Amino acid sequence: TLSSSSAASDVYKRQLYIFWEVMAFSSLGLIWYEGSRRARDAGMRYILFHLFGGGAFLAGIIIHYMNTGSIVVGPIESGIGYLLLLIGIGVNTAFIPLHTWLPDSYPKATIAGAVFMSVYTTKTGVYVLARTFSGADAVAYMGGVMVLYGVIFALLQNDVRKLLSYHIVSQVGYMVAGIGIGTYIGVNGGIAHVFNHILYKALLFMCMGAVIFRTGKNNLTELGGLAKRMPVTMITCVIAALSISGVVGFNGYVSKGMVIQAGAVSYTHLTLPTKRIV
C-alpha cells in the first residue's frame, strides 16, 4: 500500500518530512473508505491532528537547520526546535494527551484498514524518536504514563476495536519508555517490542475483524460463545492475547522484560520504594 511504502521510505531514504505527510494523508483514505458519516468525521479529526503534528515537526526541522545548518536525522540539542520536534513526533507516537486521534480513528476505519494502521502509524514515530530522543528522561516518563493510561482506558471499553486501540497506546508506551531510558537493553527492548507488537496486534485486529465480519457486532456485551463457530479465529486470538500479555514463551515476554529490566536498573529511585514495600 501507499501508506506502508511511505513508512519504509521514512526508514531507508530519510526523506522524512515528505513521506511523514504522505503517510498521514494515505492513512486518511483507509478511514474514509469505510464510507459512513462517523468515518468521515473521524478521518477529519485524524488529519487535523496530523496537520498540527506535521506543522510542529516542520517548524522544528527549520529551527534545527537554522541553528546547526544540518537536517540530518539524529540527536537534537535542547531548545524550541527540540520541543517542536518532540510534539510533532508525539502526535504520531500517541503521546498523552496527543493520542486521542488513535482510539477515535482506528475503530472507524475499514476492517483491513485498521490492521494496516495498527502496524505502521505509531511505529514510524517510534523509529524517529529512537533516532532523535534516545536517553531523554521526559520521554521515558511519558512512556510510563502511556503504559498505565492506555491499559486503564482499554479496560473501560465495550467496542472491541476501541479496546485494542487504547491498548496500542499502552504498548507503544513500552517502546517509548525503552527509548527514553536510553541504555543498550532499553533501546533494543523498545525496538524489539515494535516488531513484536506488529505481529500480535495485527493478529488481534484481524481476529476481531473476522468476528465483526461474521457477527456484524462490535460490542463485547453482544458477543460470546464463538469458540465453536470460529475455532481457528479463537486459537489465533488466544495466541495473540498470550503474546500481548507477556506470558513466558511468547514474544511479548522477551521485549517487555527487556524494557522493564532496563527501567529497574536505570530508575532505582522509583523501584526502590516498591522493593521496600514488598
Regions found by a protein language model. Name each.
Residues 1-2:
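Short, well-ordered junction/capping motifs at the entry into regular secondary structure
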Residues 6-16, 26-270, 276:
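Hydrophobic transmembrane alpha-helices and their helix-loop junctions in integral membrane proteins
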